[in-house]
Amino acid sequence: MIVFASDVHLGLRKGDPAERERRFVGWLRGLSLSKGDSLFLLGDIWDFWYEYKYVVPKDGVRVIAALLDLMDRGVEVYFAPGNHDLWCFHWFEELGMHKIDPQPAVFNLEGKKFMVAHGDGLGNDKKSFLFLRRIFHSKFCQALFSTLHPRLAFGFALRWSDGNRRTHGHYVWKGKQERLYQYACSQPSDIEYFIFGHFHTPVDETLPSGARLIILDDWIDGGTPSFTL
């Protein structure tokens, strides 16, 4: 069995953050996964994640414990950093997770061939987006950010996240006009599934090749959205 989830946004100051964490932990603990099964977390599990040399975020400690329990049972856990938690450098791998980097990545598991990524950069050629992405991925900028005290760094980042969400609001999927849809159509025809997050709106469309394009919903306002192969 292969299970996918994304966009939990642990720590997001909207609604009830503690309830959201409990809901996600309950879902993880209820998964009927065993040795040889796989769990793919496709980004933005945390609303903000940044690793210092000796410090990691406190939000989602019970989530980490639940993931460790799954790995102790022999479940393979894969993590694709999103645009909110891209600064996960080494700690998840030290815990035993598989970091998906670079993205997208193609897997062939249990007889199914699929491409996964968070989805924020695929097919997007807007100059403003590419500029901001280069800054976020810059080793120099990351080193500068690391000089900030965590209290200042996390306060700034969470306010940025809140403001960005209020500015952009709810996203409306544009179907065949979407750059991500067009990107998936341009990929090899033997890929059976394209599975992404990021857009915060559920999508399940069949491409001209017969492949399925799956966009995972977010966990912000309730439910336990996921996809299973």
Which stretches of residues belong to each language-model region?
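Short amphipathic alpha-helical patches
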Residues: S32, E51, V55, H90-E94, ...
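Charged/polar, solvent-exposed surface patches and flexible loops
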Residues: G26, D69, H90, E94, ...
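Extreme N-terminal starter segment of soluble prokaryotic enzymes
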Residues: M1-V3
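Low-complexity, flexible helical/coil segments
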Residues: S38-D44, G74-A80, F114-H118, F136-A143, ...
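Active-site-proximal loop/helix segment associated with metal-binding centers of metalloenzymes
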Residues: G119-R179
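Core catalytic region of metal-dependent phosphoesterases/phosphodiesterases
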Residues: A5, L10-L109
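Conserved beta-sheet core of the metallophosphoesterase superfamily
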Residues: H98, P102, K113-M115, D120, ...
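N-terminal short leaders/motifs
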Residues: D47-L70, L148-L152, G163-K174, Y183-I191
